[in-house]
From Swiss-Prot:
GO terms for molecular function: ATP binding; UDP-N-acetylmuramoylalanine-D-glutamate ligase activity. It is an enzyme of class 6 (ligase). It comes from the Bacteria. This is UDP-N-acetylmuramoylalanine--D-glutamate ligase. The keyword Ligase applies. NCBIfam families: murD. It catalyses: UDP-N-acetyl-alpha-D-muramoyl-L-alanine + D-glutamate + ATP = UDP-N-acetyl-alpha-D-muramoyl-L-alanyl-D-glutamate + ADP + phosphate + H(+). Keywords: ATP-binding, Cell cycle, Cell division, Cell shape, Cell wall biogenesis/degradation, Cytoplasm, Ligase, Nucleotide-binding, Peptidoglycan synthesis. It is found in: Cytoplasm. It comes from Alkaliphilus metalliredigens (strain QYMF). ATP binds at G117, T118, N119, G120, K121, T122, T123. One of its GO terms (cellular component) is cytoplasm.
Length: 455
C-alpha cells in the first residue's frame, strides 16, 4: 500500500494511536490527527508522536470537511462510531474510511488467524499463539489482546503466523482484511449501546469471513446457533468444534478426550483434566485453538503440549490469592452477562459476587438466574447498580447490597466471607464508568486484595 505523500486523517488516538501515527510517518504520509480530547488530556500521547508531518485538531471535530483539504484516506480508532455526523460527511465525499486493523493488514505479510466472538476471544487468541510458538512457528499475537496489529505489521514476513483478536468495532471498518483462518467462537447480545440491534452486532462479527474463499478456513462453534448457521452461507471451508456433540468431522470431546476427526484419521489429543484453564467455556476455547492450529499444520502432540502448559491470561478467572481460607478471583474481563455467567459456573461455590459498571444496554435477568445454588451474596456498584439490584429483587434474589465502589465492595465482601467461600469479581459490565479499561479495574481489585492481607 503506497502512503508516501498521501494525506491521511486519523480520527481518535486511543490505544492504537501512537503506533498507527508512527507507521504513517515512517511511510511518508502527511497526517492530520483529530480527537475529541483536549491537548492537555493528550499531552503524553502528543509527546510520544511529536509534531513532524502532523497537524492536530483537538477537542472537536472540524465543522467543515473542506477545511482539511484533499484527503486520500481516513483511519478510525475502533471507539469512533460510524454513524456520527462527521463520519457521515466524510462518507458522502467518497473518501475511503478504514480502521487500524485494515491498514495493518494491507501493510503486513504472513498467514492471518483471526478470532472473534462475544466471549473467549482473548484467552483463545493467547492460547492459539502459544501453541503455534511451541510448535516452532514464528508467531505474532496482536489485536484487541493488547498489542495493536499496526505495531507489528511491517515486521511480518510470508512465513509468519499472525494471530489476531478482532472486536465487532474493528470489524465494522474492514474492506480487504482476509484471514487464512477465521473463527467465530460464539455470539450473545453485547455492545448494543453501539450497534443498536443484535442483527447489526451479528453482521459486524460476520464481516470477518466476507473476503474468504474456498482456499481459506472458517472455524465455527457447532454448539452456538449463530456460529453454526453462519456456516451455511460462508465461502470458506468449514471446520466445526463442539463441546456437547461428537461430530463426523471436526474437533470435539469424546470420552473426556479432545479429539480431532478428519476424513482420513482420528487423533486423540489430550484428556480434558490436563488443561489448566477453568470452566466449560475454556474447554470450548481449547477446542477452537486445537482446530485453528491443526489446520495450519501443528501436530496433535504439539497441540497437547500447548494446551497442557497454558496457564490462562490475566483478568479472566485469575486466581489472586487465598486469605484465611477465602479465595479471591479476578474476572474483570467479564464485561457482559454471558461472560460472567460462565465465570459463576466455573468458580467454586459459595460465591460472594462483585458486579457492576457501565451499562451496555443488556438485560440482567439471565445473569441473576445463574446465581441459584452458587452465589450467596451479591455486591453491586457503578452505573448499573440500580438496574442489577432491582433485577435481583424482581427475581427473588434478596441477598444483595449496593455499595459505592469496588473498594467498598471488597471490604464488605471480606466481612461477609467465611473459610471456603470465593470472592469473585465478575462485573458483567464495561469498566468505563470508573476505569479506563477492564485491565485497570482488575489491577485495582488485585491491589485491594493485597492490602487486605497486609491489614
Amino acid at each position: 500500500m503506497e502512503l508516501k505523500n498521501k494525506k491521511v486523517l486519523v480520527i481518535g488516538l486511543a490505544v492504537t494511536g501512537v503506533p498507527l501515527v508512527r507507521v504513517l510517518k515512517q511511510q511518508g504520509a502527511q497526517i492530520i490527527v483529530n480527537d475529541m480530547k483536549s491537548e492537555v488530556d493528550l499531552a503524553e500521547t502528543i509527546d510520544a508522536i511529536g509534531h513532524e508531518q502532523i497537524e492536530y485538531i483537538l477537542g472537536r471535530h472540524p465543522e467543515e470537511l473542506t477545511t482539511l483539504g484533499e484527503l486520500d484516506l481516513v483511519v478510525l480508532s475502533p471507539g469512533v462510531p460510524l454513524d456520527i455526523p462527521f463520519i457521515q460527511q466524510i462518507k458522502a465525499q467518497g473518501i475511503e474510511i478504514i480502521g487500524e486493523v485494515e491498514l495493518a493488514f494491507r501493510l503486513s505479510r504472513g498467514k492471518i488467524v483471526a478470532i472473534t466472538g462475544t466471549n473467549g476471544k482473548t484467552t483463545t487468541t493467547a492460547l492459539t499463539g502459544e501453541i503455534f510458538k511451541g510448535a516452532g512457528k514464528n508467531t505474532y499475537v496482536v489485536g484487541n489482546i493488547g498489542v495493536p496489529f499496526i505495531e507489528k505489521a511491517l515486521d511480518t514476513t510470508e512465513e509468519d503466523v499472525i494471530v489476531i483478536e478482532v472486536s465487532s468495532f474493528q470489524l465494522e471498518s474492514i474492506k480487504e482484511f482476509h484471514p487464512k483462518v477465521g473463527t467465530l467462537l460464539n455470539l450473545t447480545p453485547d455492545h448494543l449501546n453501539r450497534h443498536k440491534t443484535i442483527e447489526n452486532y451479528r453482521e459486524a462479527k460476520l464481516n470477518l469471513f466476507m473476503n474468504q474463499s474456498l482456499q481459506d478456513y472458517a472455524v465455527l462453534n457447532y454448539d452456538d446457533i449463530t456460529s453454526r448457521e453462519a456456516g451455511k452461507t460462508l465461502a470458506a471451508q468449514k471446520i466445526y468444534f463442539s463441546r456437547k456433540q461428537i461430530l463426523e468431522e471436526g474437533v470435539f470431546v469424546d470420552n473426556q478426550l479432545i479429539t480431532i476427526q478428519t476424513k482420513e484419521k482420528r487423533y486423540d489429543v489430550i484428556h480434558i483434566d490436563e488443561i489448566k484453564i477453568l470452566g466449560q467455556h475454556n474447554l470450548e476455547n481449547a477446542l477452537a485453538a486445537t482446530a485453528m492450529t491443526f489446520i495450519l499444520g501443528v501436530s496433535a502432540e504439539d497441540i497437547a503440549k500447548g494446551l497442557r502448559n497454558f496457564p490462562g491470561v490475566a483478568h479472566r478467572l485469575e486466581f489472586v490469592e487465598e486469605i484465611e481460607g477465602v479465595k479471591y478471583i479476578n474476572d474483570s474481563k467479564g464485561t457482559n452477562t454471558d461472560a460472567s455467567i460462565k465465570a459463576i459456573e466455573a468458580a467454586q461455590a459459595p460465591i460472594i459476587l462483585l458486579a457492576g459498571g457501565q451499562d451496555k444496554g443488556g438485560d440482567f435477568t439471565d445473569f441473576v438466574k445463574a446465581f441459584d445454588g452458587k452465589v450467596k451474596h451479591l455486591l453491586v456498584y457503578g452505573e448499573t447498580s440500580d438496574n442489577i439490584y432491582e433485577t435481583a429483587l424482581h427475581n427473588n434474589f434478596k441477598v444483595v447490597s449496593q455499595v459505592r465502589d469496588l473498594e467498598e465492595a471488597v471490604i464488605r465482601a471480606k466481612g461477609i466471607a467465611q473459610a471456603g467461600d470465593t470472592i469473585l469479581l465478575s462485573p458483567a459490565c464495561a469498566s468505563w464508568d470508573m476505569y479506563p479499561n477492564f485491565e485497570a479495574r482488575g489491577q485495582h481489585f488485585k491491589k485491594l486484595v493485597s492490602s487486605l492481607r497486609r491489614s
